[in-house]
A protein has these predicted regions:
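Acidic/polar, glycine-enriched structural segments that form the non-catalytic walls/loops
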Residues: 1-334
Length: 334
């Protein structure tokens, strides 16, 4: 038990939606639920990204009556990142043997971390480590670092990094009879061999949402300049990166995302600003350092201590209190 980390040492599908809510990261401009990057919306997972003030209305017919509902729109999912080995199935935590699992929300830095050691059906053992942030000082930026270690195998690895606009508002069972598709596609584009672009628009409030994503791969610390295959649909775009790994290799993929809205102040055009901000963004470690510094300053002002020497119960109370403070700060964006 730590006063500064919300820790899970096992994977429990029945608890995933609760954990995703508790592990939400945000900065007052937008927030992203703590769903795994490979997660697909369903009974177990519900990926969600939400913009402050990002509402939209839909009309539905219920029992012969027209009903109008207003929702905070689930925005395009910037997280999608998965992989497969030797052309097999895409990574699915429920289809592998989990040898070790650790997930931690670092409250001090507002960083979500996950480490999974697993064996697949071919008994290939791998270690997957991920860190994620939604930048407190640069409100339009988020980043995800993924590391894959081949422990006892060699082979071809394919990574798929995507922006997904096929999302709906479907997180609350009792509202599933209402209209839930709040977004319509405007444009998808492969900007270069590392950068993808997606623009959507809310159907009634007519707010445009632009996302730009940059994916960079490093094999054993060396930047890999690859020519990925691009997969695109009207509301979805992905890069497929393929390269070979040998036993003991470490492959790292850094995904940085910029998100803008047409209602943002002092911008030229949301798509242009999304791309410009992304191009100026540093590496994951650089973003992590500046993000952590902002949180250090916040905790100096807002931390509340519970007397020392209170044992495990005192640590638990301190953890709960700091978790609430973290979410308050992520919402208010001081």
């Amino acid at each position: 038990l730590s006063e500064w980390a919300l820790v899970y040492e096992n994977y429990d599908p029945g608890q995933e939606r609760l954990r995703e809510a508790l592990c939400t990261l945000g900065n007052g401009y937008f927030a992203t639920r703590g769903a795994a990057p490979e997660a697909v919306a369903g009974e177990v997972h519900y990926p969600g990204t939400y913009l402050a003030g990002g509402y939209n209305r839909l009309r539905s017919e219920i029992a012969g009556q027209e009903v109008e509902n207003e929702d905070l729109v689930n925005l395009p999912n910037w997280l999608p990142l998965t992989f497969r080995i030797d052309g097999g199935d895409w990574f699915d935590l429920e289809q592998v043997q989990i040898l070790d699992y650790h997930q931690s929300l670092d409250l001090h830095r507002a960083v979500l971390e996950r480490s999974v050691r697993f064996a697949d059906a071919e008994q290939r053992i791998s270690r997957l480590s991920q860190r994620r942030l939604v930048h407190m000082g640069m409100p339009h930026l988020a980043a995800l670092a993924t590391t894959l270690v081949a422990e006892n195998w060699s082979g071809s690895v394919e990574f798929r990094s995507a922006l997904d606009g096929r999302v709906v508002n479907d997180g609350v069972a009792r509202y599933r009879g209402l209209g839930n598709r709040h977004l319509e596609p405007l444009r998808v584009e492969e900007h270069d061999s590392e950068t993808l672009f997606l623009k959507m628009r809310t159907t009634q409030s007519r707010r445009e949402i632009a996302l730009a994503a940059r994916s960079r791969l490093y094999l054993n610390g060396e930047h890999q300049e690859l020519q990925p295959e691009c997969e695109r649909k009207p509301d979805y775009i992905a890069h497929h990166f393929r390269l070979d790994m040998t036993e003991g290799d470490t492959l790292r993929l850094e995904k940085c995302v910029s998100l803008y809205s047409s209602r943002d102040r002092a911008i030229t055009e949301c798509g242009t600003d999304a791309l410009n901000t992304l191009h100026r963004a540093g590496t994951f470690e650089e973003l992590l350092a500046s993000h952590s510094e902002h949180w250090l300053q916040l905790w100096r002002r807002f931390d509340i201590g519970i007397g020392e020497n209170n044992g495990e119960q005192g640590e638990r109370h301190a953890l709960i209190l700091r978790l609430h403070i973290l979410h308050m700060l992520q919402t208010s964006s001081p």
